[in-house]
């Protein structure tokens, strides 16, 4: 079983397209707000465990095992967000941090039951796709920057940024 810290690194690698491309330690350092030597050390541990591969001067990317494990973490996180909103009546700006804590602590059986309880949803409350069968492709990738002022759009995906969610909730 991986530590929370290692799982957070795997998610950071995937978030920075590390399923297809190499991600530099500098990018991970900035993304995670962690000093570069610490990133290098953790990447070494993840590589030794078989979750990532590294290439000198290119960076790190997820292996097949690393991607499988990372998608499982994301599935847990997104199901928890939905559960917290739909069942426990949390506000959507509150759920990300709660899910961050809980995603590392629930069993596979709990995830299966949660998925069933929620009727096998396709997306989390923020519009992020819930991975299934080791597949992960976001549905909503067009940004609002692609539209002109006055265009009528429906927002289907927002990032889990607390300040943004609070702002949107107030409108």
Label each PLM-derived region with a short phrase:
Residues 2-34:
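N-terminal helix-turn-helix DNA-binding core of bacterial DNA-binding proteins
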Residues 37:
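Key DNA-contact positions within bacterial/archaeal DNA-binding proteins
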Residues 43-44:
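Short, hydrophobic-biased segments on the C-terminal half of alpha helices
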Residues 47-55:
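A short, conserved structural fragment
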Residues 58-77:
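Basic, amphipathic "hinge/linker" alpha-helix immediately C-terminal to the N-terminal HTH DNA-binding motif
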Residues 75-111:
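Ordered, amphipathic secondary-structure segments that act as subunit-interaction surfaces
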Residues 104-171:
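Mid-protein regulatory/catalytic core that forms ligand/cofactor-binding pockets
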């Amino acid at each position: 079983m991986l530590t929370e810290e290692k799982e957070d690194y795997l998610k950071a690698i995937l978030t920075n397209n590390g399923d297809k491309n190499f991600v530099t330690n500098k990018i991970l350092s900035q993304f995670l707000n962690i000093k570069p030597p610490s990133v290098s050390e953790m990447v070494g541990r993840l590589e030794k465990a078989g979750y990532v591969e590294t290439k000198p001067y290119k960076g790190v990317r997820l292996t097949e095992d690393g991607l499988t494990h990372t998608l499982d973490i994301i599935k847990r996180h997104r199901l928890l967000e939905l559960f917290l909103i739909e069942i426990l009546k949390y506000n959507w700006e509150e759920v990300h941090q709660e899910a961050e804590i809980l995603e590392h602590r629930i069993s596979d059986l709990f995830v299966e039951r949660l998925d069933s309880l929620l009727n096998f949803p396709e997306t989390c409350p923020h519009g992020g796709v819930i991975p299934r069968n080791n597949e992960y492709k976001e549905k909503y990738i067009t940004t609002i920057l692609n539209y002109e002022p006055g265009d009528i759009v429906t927002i289907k995906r927002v990032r889990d940024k607390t300040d943004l969610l609070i702002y949107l909730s107030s409108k």
